[in-house]
Amino acid sequence: MSKRLLILEDGTIFEGEALGANLDVTGELVFNTGMTGYQESITDQSYNGQILTFTYPIVGNYGVNRDDYESIHPTCKAVVVHEAARRPSNWRMQMSFDEFLKSKNIPGITGVDTRAITKIVREHGTMKASLVQARDEVDHQMSQLQATVLPTNQVETSSTATAYPSPNTGRKVVVVDFGLKHSILRELSKRECNLTVVPYNTSAKEILEMEPDGVMLTNGPGDPTDVPEAIEMIKEVQGKIPIFGICLGHQLFSLANGATTYKMKFGHRGFNHAVREVATGRIDFTSQNHGYAVSSENLPEDLMITHVEINDNSVEGVRHKYFPAFSVQFHPDAAPGPHDASYLFDDFMDLMDNFKK
């Protein structure tokens, strides 16, 4: 295998072996602590523009299959692993991890100390990084990295460009796609919801004209303040139709009601984040993937905190006191991860049914 370098913004350089597509890329370096679920993570649009480091020591041992995609066209910049499995085996497997990365034009690096990389990010925060072929001109590559300005509003490249239906016989739900995970559609479809998926910039007028029973605000990448049109849409829709927001949808719903958001030092990315429900004390283990959070300081009077993360006490869920609307920062759809919080989809069904009475 040819050699590659992972160059960090702080000047640290890791050398390893090439994996996946033959590309030089620059992105935001983040880490995921999950032990499995690499296919779902890489195809999660929330990683748009990011270099994804897996902390688990071996990745790819069960290959890649046709069922576990969260999106067909992944947008993460690159992947970093300590060891890529060379002899994967699973009855569902269609291709190896390396073949999958090549098919999706995603470069990677293996044979590096991913726990050392994670420690740097934990101590210094997320930072820019470049994955390049090992050459002599490292100083030039470093200067290029320092000069690179990462793009904003990744939602634009993660959302569907046109509306499309996913028909069923039950409640009519408009799903606003900010970087939709397929597992959200699966959870709604299991409950027989008649779905229409719309682009992120769909207006409130267009949504209201569809006369839905509810609106789902999905997950997605980046800074929620980069999507002002969605914030305005939520302001106009709430109170007229029940709303359920997940991940980025949670942040946008909170901003629409006067809350503020902030960039976290290194975010929550993994499948074992413990979340406490404030009202009952119930603890759920959740799947999370976000670098921004809703601030608990000066939270608007109209919102109440429903869930908090037990390690850093960050806001993990809010509910509107007067409108039929709530949101959570974690992924109740899991995929991958625990299904402790899947009951929230049932709460959304009840919210729509009660609103119609």
Swiss-Prot record:
Keywords: Amino-acid biosynthesis, Arginine biosynthesis, ATP-binding, Glutamine amidotransferase, Ligase, Nucleotide-binding, Pyrimidine biosynthesis. GO terms for molecular function: ATP binding; carbamoyl-phosphate synthase (glutamine-hydrolyzing) activity; glutaminase activity. InterPro entries: Anth_synth/Amidotransfase (IPR050472), CarbamoylP_synth_ssu (IPR006274), CarbamoylP_synth_ssu_N (IPR002474), CarbP_synth_ssu_N_sf (IPR036480), Class_I_gatase-like (IPR029062), CPSase_GATase1 (IPR035686), GATASE (IPR017926). Pathway: Amino-acid biosynthesis; L-arginine biosynthesis; carbamoyl phosphate from bicarbonate: step 1/1; Pyrimidine metabolism; UMP biosynthesis via de novo pathway; (S)-dihydroorotate from bicarbonate: step 1/3. L-glutamine binds at S46, G220, G222, L248, Q251, N289, G291, Y292. The keyword Secreted does not apply. Belongs to the CarA family. Composed of two chains; the small (or glutamine) chain promotes the hydrolysis of glutamine to ammonia, which is used by the large (or ammonia) chain to synthesize carbamoyl phosphate. Tetramer of heterodimers (alpha,beta)4. This is Carbamoyl phosphate synthase small chain.
